[in-house]
Amino acid sequence: VQCNFSQYSSKYQRYKDHIQTNAFDPNFNGGALMDINVYNLHFVTGLFGKPKDVHYFKNVGYNGIDTSGIVIMEYPDFIATCTGAKDCSSPYTVYLQGDQGTLIVSGASSGVCKDVFFDAPKKDQIGKKAVDTKEKISIEQPNHMLYECKDFMDIILNKDDKAYTTYKEQTQMVVELLEKLS
């Protein structure tokens, strides 16, 4: 599993000029882990639950804040990497790779799963012309925040304790991971 949510912060140049804003202030829990990589952690834990161990390797700015970093999440049968950056930009993409193929999800870690592809294994391609085996399996999505608001509203109106507990437990799990990694 590879998640990447790298978004060049509009405040990063000011930070490089030593003008500190909340987004890069350790006293306000600024930084890449808390502000950006948290979305990757939610994505991975939402699919696979709590990892057996986690590690954070970060690029540190002049005031000790993490401007970018990679969380390594260890599961019994695989490793997940979560890249979060405020000092550079990259397409927001998640790769779920296995011996049966790869799911490529554009925008997943930011909450927008606008394009989903399945890429079948290519076998041994050395010396052979590459063949594009991607198949688009996306579904149309309305505004990406709409489903969250609808879920919250349904949980409250229907007093859905099971869904409430599921979301609460996932959030608590992510908070515990953030505290361990900070």
Listing of model-derived features with the role each one plays in the protein:
Residues 1-55:
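Predominantly a Rossmann-like dinucleotide-binding segment in NAD(P)-dependent oxidoreductases
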Residues 4-9, 86, 109, 122:
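Short, flexible active-site-adjacent loop segments at beta-strand->alpha-helix junctions, enriched
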Residues 10-14, 63-68, 93, 174-177:
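Short, solvent-exposed polar/charged micro-motifs at secondary-structure junctions
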Residues 27-34, 134-143:
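A short glycine-threonine-serine/GTX helix/turn-capping micro-motif
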Residues 36, 40-113, 119, 142, ...:
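Contiguous beta-strand/loop segments that form the cofactor/metal-binding neighborhood of enzyme cores
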Residues 125-127:
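Extended amphipathic ligand-handling, pore-lining, and cofactor/metal-binding catalytic surfaces
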Residues 129-137, 141, 148-151:
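Interdomain hinge/lid region at the active-site interface
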Residues 136-137, 150-182:
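C-terminal helix-rich "cap/oligomerization" subdomain common to oxidoreductases
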